[in-house]
A protein has these predicted regions:
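Short, basic-rich loop-to-helix N-cap that marks the start of a DNA-contacting helix
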Residues: 43-54
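Short alpha-helical DNA-recognition segment
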Residues: 19-38
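The alpha-helix within a helix-turn-helix
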Residues: 15, 26, 56
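A short, Lys/Arg-rich alpha-helix, primarily the initiator
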Residues: 1-21
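Short, charged recognition helix plus adjacent turn
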Residues: 38, 67-79
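Residue-level detection of the helix-turn-helix DNA-binding "recognition helix"
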Residues: 16, 30, 41, 71
Length: 79
């Protein structure tokens, strides 16, 4: 799995757990809805850490909670 795919999968999982839409996340985080959509759809090769931090603030989690997922285990990520 590529890193952008892991970020996408984790974001989808967190949105689903919170019954939150991309629009609601945009309203809470300030990250443009188009950017959130591009992250979810793996349209970006990479995502700035600052954007992930803003998303985490909108999700009301800290950044370590975002990355605390099997998606980010070394064995699951391609080099």
């Amino acid at each position: 799995m590529q890193l952008n795919e892991a970020v996408s999968a984790r974001l989808k999982e967190l949105l689903r757990e919170r019954n939150m839409t991309q629009y609601q996340l945009y309203m809470k985080s300030g990250v443009p809805k188009s950017s959130i959509g591009n992250i979810v759809n793996c349209a970006y090769d990479s995502v700035k850490l600052r954007v992930i931090l803003e998303i985490c603030q909108g999700l009301e989690i800290n950044i370590s909670e975002f990355f605390n997922s099997p998606y980010f285990d070394e064995t699951n990520l391609e080099p």
